[in-house]
């Protein structure tokens, strides 16, 4: 059973009565009449209306498939793209920045590197007492103090703005802060409170005037006590104010230990004894800090950074540090009290490993409901009842407590560099938290009533000051209006999109006209596609308020203003109903109906079609004649010259309906500049004779003007001028060929490039290897290349350039000697050094190149009396030791240990050569961003192949094989280095790539170990392309390369801090200075 034929199942069956366009045009040409059936065939009206094609078919004017996507389909752009993409094109939606409610805190914009200020401002704002103090300021005071004014406005917006985040730019600009420089948040808080304290002192409102001192200021005293008499020093009674307590955390695990360390007693003994006024002598004593009073809000500054004297930089301490949810500070006072219990109210966090970079966020507790919030610039996240987020499996309205005596506690973990957990506790029901990034802790005193029960004494008067109400309302109104305008704009646009889609679907549904319909209209496919696919079609005209596109049918019109059959693939056949819908709305045109087919174009098409058939048939009939002409078989009769390459290409071209540009100029390549026939031996002038019939066809279809075509009958004579010129050139080439042949024969061994066997006692002459290489290439060039290579430089000029003017000695050395199998030769080179030639060759060179025989550079092979003598001879060129074999050793033994070397006349000028080589070496070592290769060797010793590659001397401009860089084991790396790169920097690169700490790296070039970390690669003669190898000694433990880089920074920028801002002006200047010294 045969299988069904499925190869053409996707093709539409052609109607039985359909003729090909070529047949229809032939009929029109022969009869001169155009029938209705002919129009249906040529305009493809007969094709059925299709449904469900994969794409729009150009071959059918009745196909409207693919102009819009399928049902529920989308496109990447235009009218049919996804709705969210259309909305995105309208611009950002301001409603996305809408604040849920005033119960949800608002964020602050980061202007580049102002996260340190944002975090502090959020901590201050969330402190209700501080916020009320700022809100109670008089308008006159705000006008007098711009910083207070901007702070109050910022707090007012954080309080009542409808936006989810507030622009902090006006406040930052007023403080004159550089928003591109990261600063220390602790330093900012200290200076900012000092600035506020001075500005607030002008207020007459008691709650505002001393709000900073009341909330944040406590007092301490430094007590020095004599161990002999037990008396305190006079200075011990002096109390000093503090706004935060700076606690060490290095080597300490929790807040209790840090407080113990802060209040610990220091012994003054030995050389550090104290002079007691009472005892009137130096005695042992103790010194400690005593807390005299505590403010309602205690700020603990954790010293996360340590100073590295070696690099004058700061390094962050990233160890975990624990702190409690409640803290009893009463026992820490010099006069203990039970009413000083503090609750954790804010945590300032520094994310990042470096001291001068990273990011600040704040976790702050809402005093009104106990909820914790994370403030990360513009983003504010609810954390629940725990400062680092809710516990797994616990509801947000319950805290986790353990009874007295419990040994463990549940853990709360935050993996975002904050590793927070609850630690063990034994004395009270409390929570402990731990963080590797906590930078500052804020604790607020817990108020208790007379019965000892915690009370919330937050004032209910938390409304916005009246002088900010109008401003905030105006801002909110403007913002709400902006949101409403956007929503309105979006609704209008989406309604328009929906309307346009319905319109397109409606028109395209009605668009197809059946083949039987006599009334239809033509429309440009390009315009229809753009109209169906674009939101706003191009070429606008205004109708009402919406811009529409007028119909443009000009691309499918012929010069007679009608519809040509040749444009049928660029237009569609619309039903009358669909056309009237489009035309009534968009206008334009011109209107092209079913009666607007072009009779003139149809007749021209019929004529051209017949002409194409004639051209195709004539060319096919003449192909055999052209093939015979190329084979040299021409019939009797007149013959004409054409270009042989041209005719070959003419035969290879595929059959086409009309002549192409390639058919022009069958004799152009045969025509000289004088308009005559080129001699056949001229370049590109190969020709062939063709019969007259073929020539006339080529002549008529050449596409050139009649006057531009040059005809050459077979009896045409070549151009006399060109023939004479070619004869001269041929004569010169013949003479040159003879000269080169003679030199090749005279210098047969030298031409072959074989090494010359050298014998002691014979006289030789020296020629530059580079000149000899050029001469060899010159005399061996034959055929078409005989005159292409230039003649080498004059030998006399070359010889003269080898003599230094200062000492009249040689500026180059002879090539090294090689002794193999008892024969002495020179090392081969095409570029460097001097090559020795025989005396006979030099005599011939003297005659051939017109050089005086006496100008030759003489050389001979001599033997040293001893190896030491050889090394001391400046003009001696020793043999290569690595090329010695057994025969050489035997020869050396026969000569009593003497070695051969080259003695020259004149002598080699070692002084000038040394100076030249030094300059070349310096230039070569002054490289930038070049590649070197480093191999990791495992085992006691590097393989021989790596050692040899590492010890090899790099050749200038040598092409390095790419294969040498490939490795399957991953033990080879390519590094970009410069001559100024230090060995230390190179070891860091190897550390980063291969993971070997620099102390364990045994780095070699060849067999020599590379030491001295401060030396440069130029100092160690490491060139571009060198191969190094490294071995891991495994003596020292692995560590992070980031630690090494941070500790070894050479360039350290001076920290400017807040210099040049309002924070360091007048009253704050001395405080800033004190902070700098303490750091």
Curated annotation (Swiss-Prot):
One matching Pfam family: UCH
Segments for region (Disordered): 1-21, 384-419, 948-972
EC number: 3.4.19.12
Record field: compositional bias (Polar residues): 402-417
Cellular component aspect of the GO annotation: cytosol; nucleus
Principal place of residence: nucleus
Positions of transmembrane segments: none
Localization per record: Nucleus
GO MF assignments: cysteine-type deubiquitinase activity; cysteine-type endopeptidase activity
Residue intervals of the DUSP domain: 495-598, 613-715, 738-862
Keyword Hydrolase: yes
Active site, UniProt feature: 115, 359
GO BP: protein deubiquitination; proteolysis; regulation of protein stability
Keywords from the named record: Hydrolase, Nucleus, Protease, Repeat, Thiol protease, Ubl conjugation pathway
Comp. bias (Basic residues): 1-12
Domain Ubiquitin-like: 961-1037
Domain USP: start-end pairs: 106-446
Reactions mediated catalytically: Thiol-dependent hydrolysis of ester, thioester, amide, peptide and isopeptide bonds formed by the C-terminal Gly of ubiquitin (a 76-residue protein attached to proteins as an intracellular targeting signal)
Nucleus is among the record's keywords: yes
Biased composition (Basic and acidic residues): 388-401
UniProt cross-references to PROSITE patterns, sorted A to Z: DUSP, UBIQUITIN_2, USP_1, USP_2, USP_3
Top-level taxon of the source organism: Eukaryota
Family according to the record: Belongs to the peptidase C19 family.
Protein purpose: Recognizes and hydrolyzes the peptide bond at the C-terminal Gly of ubiquitin. Involved in the processing of poly-ubiquitin precursors as well as that of ubiquitinated proteins. Deubiquitinates H2BK143ub1 of histone H2B.
Protein name as it appears in the record: Ubiquitin carboxyl-terminal hydrolase 26
């Amino acid at each position: 059973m045969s299988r069904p034929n499925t190869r053409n199942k996707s093709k539409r069956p052609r109607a039985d009565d359909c003729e090909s366009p070529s047949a229809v045009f032939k009929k029109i040409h022969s009869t001169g009449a155009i029938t209705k059936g002919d129009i249906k065939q040529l305009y493809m009206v007969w094709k059925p209306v299709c449904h469900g094609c994969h794409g729009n078919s150009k071959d059918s004017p009745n196909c409207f498939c693919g102009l819009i996507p399928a049902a529920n389909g989308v496109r990447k752009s235009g009218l049919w793209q996804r709705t969210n993409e259309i909305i995105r094109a309208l611009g950002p939606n301001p409603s996305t920045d809408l604040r849920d409610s005033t119960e949800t805190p608002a964020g602050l914009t980061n202007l580049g590197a102002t996260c340190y200020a944002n975090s502090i401002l959020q901590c201050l704002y969330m402190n209700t007492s501080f916020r009320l103090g700022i809100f109670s300021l008089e308008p006159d005071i705000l006008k007098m103090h711009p910083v207070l004014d901007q702070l109050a406005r910022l707090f007012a917006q954080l309080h009542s703005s409808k936006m989810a985040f507030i622009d902090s730019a006006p406040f930052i600009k007023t403080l004159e802060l550089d928003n591109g420089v990261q600063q220390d948040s602790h330093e900012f808080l200290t200076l900012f409170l000092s600035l506020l304290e001075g500005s607030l002192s002008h207020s007459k409102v008691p709650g505002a005037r001393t709000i900073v001192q009341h909330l944040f200021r406590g007092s301490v005293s430094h007590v020095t006590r004599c161990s002999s008499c037990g008396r305190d020093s006079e200075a011990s009674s002096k109390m000093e104010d503090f706004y935060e307590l700076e606690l060490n955390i290095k080597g300490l695990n929790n807040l209790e230990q840090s407080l113990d360390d802060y209040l610990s007693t220091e012994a003054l003994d030995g050389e550090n004894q104290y002079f007691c006024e009472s005892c009137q002598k130096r005695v042992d004593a103790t010194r400690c800090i005593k807390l005299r009073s505590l403010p309602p809000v205690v700020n603990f500054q954790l010293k996360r950074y340590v100073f590295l004297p070696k690099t004058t930089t700061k390094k962050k301490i990233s160890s975990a540090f624990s702190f409690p949810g409640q803290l009893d500070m009463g026992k820490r006072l010099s006069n203990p009290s039970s009413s000083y219990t503090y609750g954790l109210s804010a945590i300032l966090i520094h994310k990042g490993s470096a001291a001068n970079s990273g990011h600040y966020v704040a976790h702050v507790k809402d005093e009104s409901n106990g909820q914790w919030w994370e403030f990360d610039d513009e983003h504010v996240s609810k954390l629940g009842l725990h400062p680092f987020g809710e516990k797994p499996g616990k509801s947000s309205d319950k805290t986790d407590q353990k009874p007295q005596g419990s040994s463990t506690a549940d853990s709360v973990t935050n993996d975002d560099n904050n590793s927070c957990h609850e630690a063990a506790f034994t004395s009270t029901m409390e929570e402990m938290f731990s963080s590797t990034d906590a930078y500052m802790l804020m604790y607020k005193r817990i108020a208790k009533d007379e019965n000892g029960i915690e009370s919330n004494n937050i004032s209910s008067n938390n409304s916005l000051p009246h002088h900010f109400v109008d401003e905030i309302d105006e801002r909110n109104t403007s913002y709400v209006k902006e949101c409403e305008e956007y929503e309105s704009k979006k609704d209008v646009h989406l309604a328009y999109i929906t309307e346009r889609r319905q319109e397109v679907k409606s028109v395209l549904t009605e668009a197809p006209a059946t083949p039987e319909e006599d009334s239809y209209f033509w429309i440009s496919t390009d315009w229809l596609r753009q109209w169906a696919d674009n939101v706003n079609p191009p070429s606008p005209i205004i109708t009402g308020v919406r811009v529409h596109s007028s119909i443009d049918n000009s691309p499918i019109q012929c010069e007679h203003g009608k519809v040509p059959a040749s444009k049928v693939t660029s237009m569609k056949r619309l039903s009358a109903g669909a056309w009237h819908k489009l035309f009534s709305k968009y206008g334009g045109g011109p209107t092209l109906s079913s009666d607007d087919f072009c009779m003139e174009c149809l007749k021209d098409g019929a004529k051209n079609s017949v002409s194409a058939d004639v051209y195709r048939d004539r060319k096919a009939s003449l192909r055999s004649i052209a093939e015979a002409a190329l084979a040299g078989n021409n019939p009797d009769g007149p013959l004409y010259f054409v270009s042989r390459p041209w005719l070959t290409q003419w035969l290879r071209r595929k059959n086409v309906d009309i002549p192409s540009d390639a058919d022009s100029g069958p004799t152009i390549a045969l025509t000289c500049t004088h308009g005559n026939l080129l001699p056949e031996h001229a370049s590109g002038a190969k020709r062939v004779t063709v019969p007259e019939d073929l020539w006339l066809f080529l002549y008529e279809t050449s596409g050139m003007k009649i006057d531009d075509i040059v005809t050459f009958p077979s009896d045409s004579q070549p151009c006399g001028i060109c023939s004479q010129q070619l004869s001269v050139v041929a004569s010169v080439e013949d003479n040159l060929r003879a000269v080169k042949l003679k030199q090749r024969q005279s210098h047969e061994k030298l031409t072959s490039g074989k090494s010359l066997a050298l014998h002691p006692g014979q006289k030789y002459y020296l020629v530059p290897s580079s000149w000899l290489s050029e001469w060899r290439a010159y005399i061996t060039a034959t055929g078409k290349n005989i005159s292409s290579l230039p003649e080498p430089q004059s030998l006399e000029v070359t010889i003269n350039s080898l003599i230094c003017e200062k000492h009249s000695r040689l500026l180059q050395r002879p090539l090294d000697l090689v002794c193999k199998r008892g024969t002495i030769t020179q090392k081969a080179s095409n570029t460097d050094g001097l090559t020795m030639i025989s005396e006979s060759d030099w005599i011939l060179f003297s005659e051939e190149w017109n050089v005086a025989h006496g100008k030759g550079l003489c050389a001979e092979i001599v033997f040293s009396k001893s190896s030491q003598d050889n090394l001391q001879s400046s003009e001696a060129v020793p043999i290569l030791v690595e090329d010695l074999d057994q025969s050489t050793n035997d020869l050396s033994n026969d000569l009593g240990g003497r070695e051969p070397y080259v003695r020259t006349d004149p002598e080699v000028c070692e002084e000038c050569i040394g100076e030249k080589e030094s300059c070349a070496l310096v230039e070569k070592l002054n490289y930038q961003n070049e590649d070197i290769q480093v191999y990791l060797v495992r085992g006691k010793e590097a393989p021989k192949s790596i050692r040899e590659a590492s010890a090899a001397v790099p050749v200038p401009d040598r092409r390095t094989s790419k294969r040498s860089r490939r490795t399957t084991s991953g033990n080879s790396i390519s590094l970009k280095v410069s001559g100024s790169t230090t060995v230390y920097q190179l070891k860091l690169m190897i550390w980063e790539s291969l993971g070997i700490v620099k102390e364990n790296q045994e780095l070699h070039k060849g067999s020599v170990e590379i030491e001295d970390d401060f030396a440069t690669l130029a100092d160690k003669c490491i060139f571009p392309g060198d191969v190094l190898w490294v071995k891991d000694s495994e003596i020292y433990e692995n560590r992070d390369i980031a630690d090494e880089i941070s500790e070894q920074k050479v360039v350290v920028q001076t920290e400017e801090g807040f210099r040049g801002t309002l924070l360091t002006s007048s009253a704050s200047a001395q405080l800033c200075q004190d902070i700098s010294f303490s750091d």
